[in-house]
């Protein structure tokens, strides 16, 4: 009798694990579909670029710590409610996503980012009316090397 109960409990547990794995895989694919997938998709949105000033070096020799600074200015009558930094060629495209606790008309931000390769980094600003602003900035990532002729 005990062997039958253990077998039943094991089957129930394995069934529940399978259902859980299925739900997790579906939710992660839905999340991936909700994020911008490519440079082409970001360009197709034709976001206005006014009010976004981005400073990113045109050439970076250390892809692990590239300085990025930007200033966001909301259009008249609007407020900034959040922003994102997106690198479409990185394995994880969304580098940073902030939702502001208090809407602001102007925001300055500075950080260091990691890039997988040469690409355009996008700064997206989300406004209180549900619209967005976006600006791409191109940077070339090189690999530094030491050449020894010995």
Predicted regions and their residues:
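Transition segment at domain starts
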Residues: 31-62, 94-99
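Extracellular Ig-like/FN3 beta-sandwich strand-entry sites
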Residues: 116-120
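An anionic, turn-rich surface loop/hairpin at beta-sheet edges
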Residues: 91-114
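N-terminal secretory signal peptides and thylakoid transit peptides that target proteins
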Residues: 1-21
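Short edge beta-strand/loop segments characteristic of extracellular beta-sandwich folds
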Residues: 67-74
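Short acidic/polar inter-strand loop motif in beta-rich domains
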Residues: 128-134
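Short beta-strand edge segments in extracellular beta-sheet folds
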Residues: 138-144
């Amino acid at each position: 009798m005990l062997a039958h109960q253990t077998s039943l409990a094991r089957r129930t547990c394995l069934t529940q694990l399978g259902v859980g794995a299925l739900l997790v895989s579906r939710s992660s694919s839905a999340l991936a579909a909700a994020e911008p997938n490519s440079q082409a998709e970001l360009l197709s949105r034709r976001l206005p670029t006014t009010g976004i000033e981005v400073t990113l070096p045109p050439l970076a020799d250390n892809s692990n710590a590239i300085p990025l600074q930007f200033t966001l200015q909301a259009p008249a009558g609007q407020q900034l409610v959040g922003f994102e930094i997106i690198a479409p060629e990185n394995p994880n495209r969304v580098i940073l996503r902030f939702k502001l606790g208090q809407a602001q008309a102007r925001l300055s931000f500075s950080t260091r980012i990691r890039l997988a390769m040469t690409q355009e980094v996008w700064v997206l600003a989300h406004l209180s009316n549900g619209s967005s602003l976006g600006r791409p900035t191109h940077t070339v990532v090189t690999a530094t090397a030491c050449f020894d002729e010995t």
